[in-house]
Amino acid sequence: SEYKQIREKTDFLSLCKTPDLAAEVTIQPVDILGVDAAILFSDILIPVEALGVNIAFDPSPVILDPIRNIQQVNNLGDIAPEKDISFVYKTIDILVSKLKVPLIGFAGAPFTLACYMVEGGGSKNFLEIKKFMYGDEKGYSMLMDKLTDCVLKYLQAQIDHGCSVVQLFDTWGGILAPKDYSHYVFPYVKYIMDNLKGAFTVYFVRGISNYLEVIKKLTCSAIGVDWGIDISEANKRLDSRFVLQGNLDPAILLADVDIIKYHASGILED
């Protein structure tokens, strides 16, 4: 494929940091598939690196010096997105000048970024982030405040450079009990959504069925719904307040086209 040809010449992080190449792979699905929007090619950990965290991709992301105490949180820098990660915005500028369809930007939500930073990568049981969250509330709050500020600035700059939509991904938000999600995660998400200006906003948390009654307090434009709940049920519990997105198990994309169409049509009918 066209993407694989580019990847053979460069590593993933370098691709994210090279505006001409990142713009090219962003445009590829629009040209090849005719999709009605483009999704910025990047990675959710790009702004984390700008805080002073060492990241490698092997091929999954690895944090080389995980955050485990309040002193390490204190040592993290502050982010000035357009200075520290200017390559992201140069990519957006190129795309806005070339695309005839809307551009979707994105970021990782504070808790999901914290999971990577504290665990050192992906995890099966997330014991380190939970130990930090329950055992050092001051350190956890400081980390989440810093990440919330970082993500808000990062996304607002994406909007300012021309993204029509921005999405906040909380991939690991679903690891917590509902009451813990409400206390340790949701306030930071709400703050970001309340303060983003100038674009449509989308929030996705994996395991959303446990949190719908809290999430309906958000001010965002749309909610991403995973495949763990019927989309009609999610809409009902969200009081029909949001545009809903998703709901298809990604594994279905490995099936034949007729099977994919069947399941996608089922979601639209629901």
Question: Which functions belong to the PLM regions below?
Answer:
Residues 55-69, 123-130:
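A charged helix-plus-loop insertion that forms the helical arch/lid used to bind
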Residues 84-270:
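Active-site loop segments of alpha/beta catalytic cores
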Residues 44-47, 62, 71, 110-112:
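A short acidic, glycine/proline-enriched capping/turn motif at secondary-structure boundaries
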Residues 60-98:
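A gly/proline- and charged-residue-enriched helix-loop-helix capping module
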Residues 1-59, 186, 191, 261, ...:
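N-terminal basic, low-complexity leaders that serve as flexible interaction/assembly modules and, when applicable
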